[in-house]
Design a protein with these regions (language model features):
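Intrinsically disordered, low-complexity terminal regions
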Residues: 1-262
Length: 262
């Protein structure tokens, strides 16, 4: 039996949806197998990323590439400008969708900055099977859910404009999204710290009954509940000095203890 910690973050923030008229479409299926590594990185922009652990020794990748464009000229431009880069460095295999929308910032970040519409959209939908023990860093921005299932390695998952679902894992890590929900189900309780965040969504985390952990919560316009037996912990308020007085703020946070964490 699993126990559930549910945190509902119901912040009412506005979102904008833009649609464009695409008259041209072209599809391609990319299939590749790779030797197992310790770590997998998938950095997508448009599309979903689904990763499943299995008992094999290879990384099996299937990517469905879809180009939608306003004209044949823009479709040809998309073929030239947007590429799937695959690199293996040390113990890490990386799939990276590159194009004019990438920042290539001076501080080394590779963010997404679409300041103007290029007249096309290139979607990569990833399905991967990986050896169970691999760790995973997965991210996407538009139009796709991130799913991670059946792995024992650690994880770092990031999404925008969709949800993240993690099932039957026993690693630890970070899960965060905007405009989407977070659902995490552990097959074995994590042995290291975990962080789950969302804006405009809910968080549902399910653990094994023998969980021992200190849980820290922070929500804006939301509520939380758990079916674990829990003991409230004191929350340290932040303080600032203003006009000769100390002002204390709790930042809508709370904390409680489950079991007997060391």
């Amino acid at each position: 039996m699993k126990r559930v910690l549910l945190l509902v973050c119901a912040a009412a923030l506005g979102s904008t949806s833009l649609s464009y008229g695409f008259d041209q479409e072209e599809k391609e299926t990319i299939r590749r197998n790779f030797p197992a590594t310790v770590r997998l990185e998938v950095d997508d922009v448009h599309g979903f990323v689904h990763v499943t652990g299995y008992s094999g020794t290879e990384i099996q990748m299937v990517a469905e590439k879809t180009i939608r464009a306003e004209s044949q000229e823009r479709l040809d431009a998309a073929k030239r400008e947007v590429k799937l880069d695959t690199t293996q460095s040390g113990d890490t295999l990386t799939f990276y969708v590159d194009g004019p929308f990438r920042c290539h910032c001076d501080d080394g970040r590779f963010g997404v900055h679409e300041h103007s519409h290029p007249g096309y959209r290139v979607i990569y939908d990833f399905e991967l099977k990986v050896p169970t023990g691999m760790s995973a860093e997965l991210s996407t921005v538009n139009g796709g859910k991130i799913e991670l299932r059946g792995t024992t390695g650690d994880f770092d998952l990031s999404n925008v404009n969709s949800s993240i679902e993690v099932e039957e894992v026993s690693g630890a890590g970070k899960v965060q999204t905007v405009n989407g929900g977070v659902k995490v189900v552990f097959a074995g309780n994590p042995r290291k710290n975990c962080t789950f965040k969302t804006v405009n969504g809910g968080i549902e985390a399910s653990f094994r009954p023998n969980l021992s952990a200190d849980v820290h919560l922070k929500t804006f316009n939301g509520s939380a509940y758990t079916d674990f037996d829990a003991t409230a912990l004191p929350v340290t308020a932040s303080a600032e000095r203003r006009d000769g007085k100390f002002i204390y703020r709790s930042n809508r946070s709370s904390a409680f203890r489950i079991g007997n964490p060391r």
